[in-house]
């Protein structure tokens, strides 16, 4: 038996990928060029020198932390003439029946009583603390705080400031 060697593929047409370059259609060349330029442009943003951050100015929120019952801080000015001595303003007197104004700036409620806190007049307080004479924080609830002032219980909604004045008995007070 005679065996004739067979050719692996017909020789009429050579394969397209062997020894030839792949040509890109002329329409897509500008598109590829634009994509490469954009990649270099936006990729270079990561390595450019960033400008130095500017110093932060005092925020408006800082003014909210100043207690309402303290007198305003005035800048020291050297006296020009030695005139009569100026009397200092007396400190705000706390009346036993009137509660002074309270600035309520933060309210944190948690399921654990140790984690609950509020910020009154710029200071943090927990349940059982006494921010002012005769004022006790009884309970910090989810949407309000229960206070006791001179034995009278009253509530204050979370983040509502107390304008000052007498505590009156009301149905909401308990």
UniProtKB/Swiss-Prot annotation:
TM helices/strands, residue ranges: 24-44
Keywords per UniProt: Membrane, Transmembrane, Transmembrane helix, Transport
Chief place where the protein resides: membrane
Keyword flag Transmembrane helix: yes
GO cellular component, one term: membrane
Protein location: Membrane
Topology within the bilayer: Single-pass membrane protein
NCBIfam families: T2SS_GspB
Family (UniProt): Belongs to the ExeB/OutB/PulB family.
Name of the molecule in the record: General secretion pathway protein B
Organism: Klebsiella pneumoniae
Lineage, broadest ranks: Bacteria, Pseudomonadati, Pseudomonadota, Gammaproteobacteria, Enterobacterales
Name of encoding gene: pulB
């Amino acid at each position: 038996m005679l065996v004739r060697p067979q050719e692996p593929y017909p020789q009429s047409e050579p394969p397209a990928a062997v020894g030839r370059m792949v040509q890109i259609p002329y329409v897509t060349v500008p598109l590829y060029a634009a994509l490469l330029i954009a990649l270099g442009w936006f990729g270079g943003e990561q390595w450019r020198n960033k400008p130095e951050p500017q110093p932060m100015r005092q925020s408006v929120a800082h003014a909210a932390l100043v207690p309402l019952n303290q007198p305003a801080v005035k800048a020291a000015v050297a006296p020009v003439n030695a005139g009569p001595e100026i009397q200092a303003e007396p400190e705000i007197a706390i009346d036993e029946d009137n509660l002074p104004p309270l600035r309520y700036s933060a309210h944190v409620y948690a399921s654990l009583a140790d984690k609950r806190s509020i910020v009154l007049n710029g200071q943090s307080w927990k349940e059982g603390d006494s921010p002012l004479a005769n004022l006790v924080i009884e309970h910090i609830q989810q949407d309000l705080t229960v206070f006791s002032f001179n034995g009278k219980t009253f509530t204050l909604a979370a983040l509502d400031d107390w304008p000052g004045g007498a505590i009156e008995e009301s149905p909401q007070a308990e």
